[in-house]
Amino acid sequence: MSSPDRLVYMANQIGSFFKSQGPKQAVAGTAEHIKKFWDPRMKAKINEHLDAGGEGLDPDVRAALESLRKV
């Protein structure tokens, strides 16, 4: 399983890919990618990291993760 630092890095990389499409698409695209392609254990671990303050997460990535909690 990936460490929280590795997951933060991966999530931020995904977010940076979508950032050029504008803030709303950055959030939506990042959320959709994580929802579709991340293993449930990875999602649980990044959510634990978010609960602990989410250090290192890009604001758009943080918003994407928060949006997934509302689903």
Predicted features and spans:
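N-terminal acidic leader/helix
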Residues: 1-23
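N-terminal intrinsically disordered, cationic/polar leader segments
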Residues: 5-8, 28, 59, 70
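Amphipathic, hydrophobic secondary-structure cores in small proteins
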Residues: 15, 21-51
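Short, charged early-sequence alpha-helical segments and their helix-coil boundaries
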Residues: 42-68
